[in-house]
Every structure is written in structure tokens, then in C-alpha cells.
Amino acid sequence: MNISAKNPKAYTDYIASNPALFESIGSIAAGVCVTQTGQDYPGQMFVWNAFDSVKSAMEGLTKYDPAMAPKKLSAMRDIKTSAVWKPLKKFDVAPGYERVTRVMVRPGRLSAFVAAATQMENEAQAAGLNVQIGVFAPIGGGREETGTLTVRFVQPSASEMGQGLDNFFSSEISPESGFAKMISMMRPINDTIEVCQQIYSAS
């Protein structure tokens, strides 16, 4: 769920102290991402829930109506959009400092794009970078998300992301690299940097 929070820290603290919000919908993990750059509006942040299947995620939608949230919670936020996202490649829940890019990829190139993202992730890790690349397809995302994919480049810290980008821009890019293949198949729509954290775990 994408929201505009009056005070992102206060909002995060409030929902973190109320685990029943996540237990009631069957989340296995939950957290927040606060947008640091590329904001579309003040207080931009993303509240995420992880489920063990799309089935569980869809069932979770039926168990929570944002319009019926406690008054204190409602007063702390304005809801912008919500969606279900399906990961298209292996992705471990390990939030951190994240570059989030929404892209368009032609449907016939989807499998090749996911393979290129996997290749890029493997190449980056082989070069010593602590990075994970997630590719997500939206389900019921409205006009903002329809026809796009969300790509998340996840690293533990701003320093590690910055160092990785410094190294990247000072290196020659092979046309056979995973990055080059991804770029050739995608058209960027939006690009932000988010600071993410996990605030709930079912286990």
C-alpha cells in the first residue's frame, strides 16, 4: 500500500507496535519503505506485506478494509494506491537501501528479462557486491502499475549502493552482461531510492 504519511517515523512506530494489523491478514512478514529521492508527494512511503503465495495475499485483501482502520491510524496517512505483487524470480525478504525502478517490458520478452536480471545479480555478487535484484509483476495495480514491472535493487546500506555505482560507472559494460541485456529490453517509467525495514515477522 502506497501512502502519504504525515510523519513517516511516527507512522512506522505506530504500526510496528500493533502486530495485530499484520497477524489479522495472514502476513508472514511486513515492513515499510520510505522514499528518499524521486518522491511524487510529501511523506511518500510504502507499507508491504509478504505472503507465502498469491492465494494467501488475495485472501489477505478480504480481511482488511483501509476505510475501516482505527481513527488514529487513518489520521496519520492518506492512502494513494495498493496492489498485489508477484515475484518473478527468487527473492528473499531482506529489506535495506533500495533503488526501485518501474519499467515497461514487452510481454514476449518477459522471460528473457527475468533471466537477464538473474544474470546481472549473479555477476554483481561474483564481483563482491552484496546485492539482490527483485522483479515483480503487479496484480490489480490500477493505472499506475498496469503494463509495468517493478525492479528492486536491494543492498544493505547507502554506502554499499554508492560504492557499487561508483564501480559501475568507472567500468566498461559488456554487451553480453546481464545489465546490458536488461537495458535493451526495458523502458524506465519511474526511478526512486527507498529506505526499507522489516517491522513484523510471523515466526
Show where each model-derived region lies.
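Short S/T/G/P-rich N-terminal loop/turn motif that feeds into the first structured element of a domain
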Residues: M1-S203
